[in-house]
């Protein structure tokens, strides 16, 4: 089983298509289809299952996924609305959720690939390399992604 969070989004659905092209049909898409038209990105793709992100998180924390043979997690899911002003929601959805997924993967030695964001560099006046001097998030979305990047660096300092 391969998990793709944010699998109904633009990047996630293209990732699912690429996995399908490589013969992977055991893809579970985790997303939040609040926008009714978002499902269109998944049409024509081989998806073994769809899980709502909240249901999935509840199942993950409850142990329902402990016996599932997950081979990889591609974490593309996030609230990417740069105008979102609810900081608690953004931290819960983008930072805490990401930490939960990361620890699930680490505890089971599952490869975990996640998407950060160029927004952690602000306007980019300081450059776009992973150097704390260059990172200057300008909104709560960018800050939530930045915090997870920092968390990963502290937890896995040699990971690339």
Residue ranges and their predicted role:
Residues 15, 68-73, 85-113:
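NAD(P)-cofactor binding segment of oxidoreductase domains
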Residues 2-24:
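N-terminal Rossmann NAD(P)H-binding glycine-rich loop of SDR-like oxidoreductase domains
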Residues 92, 96-100, 107, 111, ...:
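Catalytic helix-loop patch of NAD(P)-dependent Rossmann-fold dehydrogenases
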Residues 44, 53-54, 58-93:
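NAD(P)H-binding glycine-rich loop region in Rossmannoid oxidoreductase-like domains
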Residues 5, 30, 73-77, 112-118:
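SDR active-site strand-loop-helix element
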Residues 28-56:
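Glycine-rich phosphate-binding loop and adjoining beta1-alpha1-beta2 segment
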